[in-house]
């Protein structure tokens, strides 16, 4: 229902804009961004994907363009000095391609005063620092945002509204923003079975100077459903109630449905002349074993030399390994439940990422709006913590491994 | 070889003239100007960074400001942003890409030429633009000078 209404809004607004464009050219601005990128990896087992929403991946002996290549078009229509419509449409690799799925943003922005602003419609997800621009590669030095932090962010946009307040001080500006809305996950299976997030509330506080910034964000939401696999496993666990008194309670823990999920992050950056140091720490948890407490983060050091930026980036995702026999000693493991026990552990492990990556890269600004980038990564994945990599088979069967990935990209805006 | 012999002095002169004009132009001071009727008398550097880098959208007196970028004069634009935030245009574009494509902020308005900027400053009381000092007319008010 939400999807349909936003498809209609996006279509109507786009139609109005195209018509208005002929009448008031200066009120309509068309711009965009894109990336043409390829990736290759030295592993068939732990293939690269930029986030969990992707079925396409880069593996050994081939060049994969789909995981990172995309193009986005943005329409900005000024209704008046204070009121604008913004529509953004991004074509990239994803399970479904239709107006709803490519509509990243479609909202009205109203500046009540220079300090107060409200926006309503489909807004870019603002969960962690780069969540709202993770596809805009020209905006950051790397080929992609760090997978360990952003690969698990469940959606690129949500439907709802936000209100923000900005207060300038002598040495910095204070920005406070609150959002309320709902949305669907990008995470999906071959059958396209997204998870719906209801009652999504987000608060962000940023202290911003030109030489430094500090941002704190917290988001809380309730998952409305399980994907099909998760629902089957939870239902199967509940059927153990005659043999184990804790089965129904544990089945609720297995399920994501009605679970409250928290996302919290702190980001900073600081410029020292040609150097920039930046980093982010994030924490995710819920009361379901499907999304167990996870620490993620990155630390980046960049050096700007003329049109060239050289950088080193360390990023990590850390979630404890889950063993059913330790967490639920009462779970009856026997011949007939052995397979179910494996599936429970798979549920508890597939979003429990445990890996770290060291990246070195170079960005060369060929023109004001065109950048060439090369990035080389070494990723150490831990057994049962490999969910960020695309692979065949179960996460619980995975072992420790080391993967190297090379990326080459052209990022542009227009 | 003959070509080089004949044209090398000419090339040297052209290069010298180009260097001279570049130096001459790069030495020309940039000022930030508003409409003559704007109440604002002076801005500090932080205020100009706020307005041109999308951090705040009003003058210190609370009135809405409209910063203007020039499209067809990369020399002036590049010199302005280098003086303002110490970044080349490619990095300024990267910075603005984040603000614009997240839908947070409307970027500066764009005028094509210096003549367009001049006209906009005359017509729009909220306009704020950067020009070479030699370009200031009696219909503009200088609110900031780069050293």
Task: Label the predicted regions.
Chain A
Residues 9-17:
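Bacterial N-terminal signal peptides
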Residues 27-29, 35-40, 62-186, 197-201, ...:
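Outer membrane beta-barrel
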Residues 41-45, 96-99, 127-133, 174, ...:
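Outer-membrane beta-barrel proteins
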Residues 39-69, 190-191, 391-394:
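Surface-exposed strand-loop-strand hairpins of Gram-negative outer-membrane beta-barrel proteins
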Residues 43-45, 107, 235-414:
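Outer-membrane beta-barrel pore domains
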Residues 17-24:
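Sec/Tat signal peptide C-region and signal peptidase I cleavage site
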Residues 112-118, 154-304:
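Signature for the C-terminal beta-barrel architecture of outer-membrane proteins
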Residues 24-52, 404-406:
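Transmembrane beta-strand segments of Gram-negative outer membrane beta-barrel proteins
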């Amino acid at each position: 229902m939400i999807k349909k209404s936003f498809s209609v809004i996006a279509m109507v607004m786009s139609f109005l804009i195209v018509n208005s464009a002929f009448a008031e050219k200066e009120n309509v601005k068309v711009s965009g961004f894109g990336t043409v990128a390829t990736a290759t990896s030295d592993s068939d087992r732990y293939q690269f994907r930029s986030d969990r929403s992707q079925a396409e991946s880069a593996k050994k002996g081939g060049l994969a363009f789909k995981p990172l290549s995309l193009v986005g078009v943005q329409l900005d229509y000024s209704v008046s000095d204070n009121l604008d419509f913004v529509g953004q449409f991004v074509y990239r690799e994803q399970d479904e391609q239709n107006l709803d799925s490519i509509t990243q943003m479609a909202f009205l922005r109203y500046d009540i005063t220079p300090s107060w602003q409200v926006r309503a419609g489909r807004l870019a997800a603002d969960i962690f620092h780069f969540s709202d621009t993770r596809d805009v590669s020209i905006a950051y030095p790397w080929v992609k945002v760090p997978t360990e932090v952003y690969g698990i962010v469940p959606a690129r946009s949500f439907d709802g509204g936000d209100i923000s307040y900005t207060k300038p001080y002598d040495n910095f500006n204070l920005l406070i923003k609150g959002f309320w809305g709902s949305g669907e996950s990008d995470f999906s299976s071959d059958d396209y079975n997204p998870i719906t997030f209801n009652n999504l509330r987000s608060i962000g506080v940023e202290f911003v100077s030109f030489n430094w910034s500090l941002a704190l964000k917290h988001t809380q939401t309730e998952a409305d459903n399980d994907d099909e696999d998760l629902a089957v496993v939870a239902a199967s666990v509940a059927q153990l109630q005659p043999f184990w008194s804790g089965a129904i309670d544990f089945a609720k823990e297995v399920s994501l449905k009605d679970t409250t999920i928290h996302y919290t992050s702190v980001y900073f950056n600081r410029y020292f002349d040609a150097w920039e140091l930046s980093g982010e720490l994030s924490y995710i948890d819920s009361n379901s074993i499907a999304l167990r407490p996870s620490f993620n983060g990155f630390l980046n050091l960049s050096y700007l030399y003329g049109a060239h930026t050289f950088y080193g980036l360390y990023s990590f995702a850390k979630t404890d390994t889950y063993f059913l026999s330790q967490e639920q000693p009462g779970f009856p493991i026997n011949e007939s439940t052995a397979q179910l026990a494996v599936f429970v552990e798979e549920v508890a492990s597939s979003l429990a990422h445990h890996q770290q990556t060291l990246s070195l890269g170079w960005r060369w600004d060929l023109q004001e709006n065109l950048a060439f980038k090369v990035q080389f990564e070494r990723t150490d994945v831990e057994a049962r913590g490999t969910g960020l990599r695309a692979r065949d088979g179960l996460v619980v069967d995975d072992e420790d491994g080391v993967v190297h990935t090379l990326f080459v990209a052209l990022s542009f805006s227009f | 070889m003959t070509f080089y012999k004949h044209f090398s002095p000419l090339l040297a002169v052209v290069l010298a003239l180009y260097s001279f004009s570049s130096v001459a132009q790069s030495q020309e001071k940039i000022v930030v100007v508003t409409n003559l009727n704007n109440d604002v008398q002076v801005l500090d550097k932080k205020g100009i960074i706020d307005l041109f880098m999308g951090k705040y959208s009003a003058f210190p007196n609370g009135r809405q400001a409209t910063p203007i970028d020039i499209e067809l004069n990369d020399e002036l634009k590049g010199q302005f942003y280098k003086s303002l935030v110490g970044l080349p245009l490619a990095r300024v574009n990267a910075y603005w890409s984040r603000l614009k494509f997240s839908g947070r902020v409307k970027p500066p308005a764009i005028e094509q030429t210096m003549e367009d900027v001049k006209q906009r400053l005359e017509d729009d009381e909220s306009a704020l633009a950067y020009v070479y000092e030699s370009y200031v007319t009696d219909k503009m008010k200088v609110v900031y000078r780069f050293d």
